[in-house]
């Protein structure tokens, strides 16, 4: 885990000082493809709604065409020891080919090309069929991938039990790659509460290929389970807020000297219950992250956790002690201790120990402004007062938002969102 810290003036109240701790989880497998053999059972949604474009507001390629293209590239890029089974589903489910190696699957590429979409959606049938196609596999790395727009309006009550059985009894993990912004994310969130399962939402034409081809080996191999971070309670500070910055389009600089997960592992713990600690973050499963090298620096794709600290007395700067717990894939439990001190930043205004935390705080204020849009309109706050807040936030982002993006396309998108809030402030809420 990598720690960073910051002290800033509240951008809306210069008399108020804020302290932040930033956390980024890292592992020794980040940026490295795991080359163990992988058995995949893929279920492809061919319901009628898959004929729609991925974004209902555009006239781009249909979801089914994008899915088939990504599936073809996935097959062409798998390792020689990997195996894939494919079933298609609408109201019913049908196996296109059983668990097969790369060479055998090539004979079925033309069949995939000719798949058409029609009918309704039954995810329970799809999952049942996907399980049947992989249940006899002896490989320890077994995963089902559901490629679907998740528009199952009448999900079977047995689906939740089937998911639990798949993961906990059969040791088969599930990945959902949903297509479109109107997907049933509540169902996906439920499935992802099971260990080893994860969920990705494709809302752009390039997303399916990104998840299923470029990042296949990052999203299919869990590193650890029951991951949590605790902070030691202290009378000298209070936790004001915990902010999870999980923007898919953000990457954060990695300090190569920071100790990664599963490196220099401490001995297994006997009892990890400690009532003097407060849980600040929990994740059912941890997966490796993609790394990007830009101008000689290494950036990690993934999320930043911000802890907003309120000091009881500005003259007392306590150590902030944290503890990380996790269970490895073999069931062994581990913990690691971390500590960070605020003394060296107490007299500095707008101090950031690295660009990760300045970017994270920028996004925190950006999110605050977007949420404030509706609240201000509801409370009939004058537009001029709202615009003042937006301008302050834009100035902060322009100065402190840093990413690997040379063209600043991501930052410019956020700034455009803020401008749109001002432009649409006078219009009624739909």
PLM features: residue spans?
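Long, acidic serine/threonine- and proline-rich intrinsically disordered regions
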Residues: 1, 260-430
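Exposed acidic/Ser/Thr-rich ligand/metal-binding surfaces
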Residues: 5-228, 312-314, 416-430
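Intrinsically disordered, low-complexity coil segments
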Residues: 8-12, 52-60, 235-237, 294-298, ...
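Short intrinsically disordered coil segments
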Residues: 38-42, 244-249, 339-341
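Short, solvent-exposed coil/turn linker segments
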Residues: 62, 99-102, 158, 243-246, ...
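A broadly tuned preference for mixed-charge, low-complexity surface segments
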Residues: 73, 134-145, 194-199, 231, ...
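Surface-exposed loop/edge segments in extracytoplasmic proteins
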Residues: 95, 238-239, 332-336
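Acidic, polar loop-rich interaction surfaces within structured domains
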Residues: 136, 140, 157-173, 179-329
């Amino acid at each position: 885990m990598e720690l960073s810290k910051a002290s800033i003036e509240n951008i809306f109240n210069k008399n108020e000082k804020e302290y932040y701790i930033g956390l980024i989880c890292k592992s020794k497998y980040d940026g490295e493809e795991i080359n163990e053999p992988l058995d995949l059972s893929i279920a492809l949604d061919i319901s009628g709604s898959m004929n729609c474009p991925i974004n209902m507001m555009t006239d781009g390629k249909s979801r089914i065409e994008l899915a088939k293209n990504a599936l073809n590239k996935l097959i062409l890029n798998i390792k020689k020891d990997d195996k894939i089974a494919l079933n298609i589903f609408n109201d019913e489910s049908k196996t296109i080919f059983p668990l097969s190696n790369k060479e055998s699957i090539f004979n079925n590429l033309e069949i995939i090309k000719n798949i058409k979409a029609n009918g309704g959606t039954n995810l329970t049938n799809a999952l049942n069929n996907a399980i049947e196609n992989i249940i006899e596999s002896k490989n320890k790395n077994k995963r089902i991938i559901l490629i679907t727009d998740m528009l199952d309006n009448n999900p079977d009550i047995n689906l939740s039990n089937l998911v639990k059985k798949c993961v906990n009894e059969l040791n088969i993990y599930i990945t959902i790659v949903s297509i479109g912004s109107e997907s049933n994310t509540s169902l996906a969130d439920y499935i992802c509460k099971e260990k080893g399962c994860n969920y990705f939402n494709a809302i752009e034409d390039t997303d399916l290929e990104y998840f299923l081809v470029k990042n296949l080996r990052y999203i299919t191999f869990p590193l650890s389970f029951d991951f949590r971070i605790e902070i030691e309670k202290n009378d000298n500070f209070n936790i004001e807020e915990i902010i999870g910055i999980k923007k898919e389009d953000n990457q954060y600089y990695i300090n190569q000297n920071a100790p990664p997960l599963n490196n220099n592992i401490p001995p297994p713990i006997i009892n990890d219950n400690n009532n003097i600690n407060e849980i600040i973050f929990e994740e059912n499963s941890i997966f490796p992250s993609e790394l990007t090298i830009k101008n000689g620096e290494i950036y990690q794709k993934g999320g930043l956790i911000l802890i907003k600290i309120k000091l009881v007395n500005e003259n007392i700067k306590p150590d902030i002690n944290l503890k990380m717990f996790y269970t490895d894939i073999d069931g062994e439990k581990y913990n690691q201790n971390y500590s960070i001190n605020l003394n060296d930043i107490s007299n500095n205004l707008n101090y950031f120990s690295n660009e990760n935390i300045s970017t994270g705080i920028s996004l925190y204020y950006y999110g605050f402004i977007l949420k404030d849009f509706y609240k201000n309109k509801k409370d009939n706050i004058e537009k001029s007062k709202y615009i003042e807040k937006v301008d302050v936030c834009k100035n902060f982002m322009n100065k402190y938002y840093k990413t690997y993006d040379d063209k600043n396309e991501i930052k410019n998108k956020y700034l455009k969102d803020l401008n749109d809030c001002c432009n649409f402030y006078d219009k009624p809420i739909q």
